[in-house]
C-alpha cells in the first residue's frame, strides 16, 4: 500500500496485529500438533524417551504457544507488512525459527549428556520451517481480514 505522499502505509494497527497473531498462533498449534502428535512422536521417543514426561505440562506449553507468536508477529510479520512482501515474512520467520530453536537445541547439545545431534538438526530445520509458515499465515491473515490504509 502506498499513501498519497508516496510513503508506505503503516499496517500496524492493533486490529492487524491481533489478526496476524491469531493467524500465526493457529498455524503454530495445528502444524506443531501434527508434527509432535502424528509425524514425529516415535522419533522423539527413540531420541530422548527417558527425558520425556508421560504427558506434557499444559501451563508451560500454553505459555510457549501464547508467547512465540508475539515474536513471530513482531520480528517477521510487521516488517513484511510494511514492505508488502510475504517473501520477507517467510525469510524473517525462517531466521527467527532457526535462531529460537537453535538456541534451545544447541544449548541442550552443549550441556546435556546424550542429547542427539540428529534431533538438534531436525528440530532446528523444523523451527525454521514452522516459524516461516506461521509468519506467512500471520501476513496473509492481515491481507485477507485486516484493515488497509489506502
Where are each of the predicted segments found?
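Short, Lys/Arg-enriched N-terminal segments with co-localized hydrophobic residues
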Residues: 1-13
Amino acid at each position: 500500500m502506498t499513501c498519497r505522499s508516496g510513503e508506505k502505509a503503516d499496517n500496524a494497527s492493533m486490529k492487524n496485529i491481533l489478526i496476524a497473531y491469531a493467524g500465526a498462533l493457529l498455524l503454530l498449534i495445528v502444524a506443531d500438533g501434527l508434527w509432535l502428535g502424528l509425524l514425529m512422536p516415535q522419533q522423539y521417543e527413540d531420541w530422548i524417551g527417558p527425558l520425556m514426561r508421560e504427558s506434557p505440562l499444559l501451563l508451560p506449553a500454553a505459555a510457549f504457544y501464547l508467547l512465540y507468536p508475539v515474536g513471530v508477529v513482531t520480528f517477521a510479520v510487521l516488517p513484511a507488512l510494511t514492505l508488502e512482501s510475504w517473501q520477507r515474512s517467510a525469510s524473517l520467520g525462517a531466521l527467527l525459527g532457526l535462531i529460537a530453536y537453535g538456541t534451545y537445541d544447541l544449548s541442550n547439545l552443549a550441556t546435556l549428556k546424550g542429547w542427539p545431534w540428529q534431533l538438534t538438526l531436525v528440530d532446528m530445520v523444523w523451527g525454521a520451517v514452522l516459524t516461516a509458515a506461521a509468519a506467512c499465515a500471520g501476513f496473509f491473515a492481515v491481507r485477507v481480514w485486516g484493515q488497509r490504509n489506502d
